[in-house]
């Protein structure tokens, strides 16, 4: 295949644009701002779970408090009933003794229930404080995530601008090559990653391998308009006065 040396040299410009496109694509895949968003999303989920866990605990404690209040109220009503019977003077000695014994038992039971209620209410108060703390943590995580998403979107927008510029440059450059030369370049780029590279100081700019004397001698004898390729990676080699020929 033949192409004017000036045309071959422009392949380096195309390769430079393609290298930048490759870097842009790689940066998209490993974008630090995206990784930070993902980390903060996980953090927000964890803090949301922690907040929900405390909410469930508070609901359970509220249910326990209502149950204890109901039991305490029932005991007090029985106490009031028994005291009413005691003060009525209408009960006999045996029933009087039974009522007094029952009142003692009811009072003991009420105190146990009231102590339990105090314990649950204290736990409920602590849980409410935990919930407020968890809510503050969640609010902070959501604010951090919003900020990280903004930075990520800005970074992606910058990459989009850079890619659009490279796409435009590539389109302009591609139109200046013979179809057969461009086809060889594109095929090599698709398989080897780098379509064309500078031969400099006897070293291929694509695979970075130094060519042996025999290969260098062969290339040196090849007409300037003949397209030569690296024997190692098959990239198109662009020759200049710095090629070491």
Predicted segments, located by residue:
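Amphipathic alpha-helical coiled-coil segments
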Residues: 53-65, 106-127, 173-174
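Coiled-coil termination/hinge junctions
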Residues: 145-206
